[in-house]
Amino acid sequence: GLIDVRCYDSSQCE
């Protein structure tokens, strides 16, 4: 997500 700069693709984020 844009808020968590470590994870640009929200699909990759849990």
UniProtKB/Swiss-Prot annotation:
GO terms for molecular function: potassium channel regulator activity; toxin activity. Expressed by the venom gland. One of its GO terms (cellular component) is extracellular region. Keywords: Disulfide bond, Ion channel impairing toxin, Neurotoxin, Potassium channel impairing toxin, Secreted, Toxin. It is found in: Secreted. Contains 4 disulfide bonds. Blocker of potassium channels (Kv). Belongs to the short scorpion toxin superfamily. Potassium channel inhibitor family. This is Leiurutoxin-3. It comes from Leiurus quinquestriatus quinquestriatus.
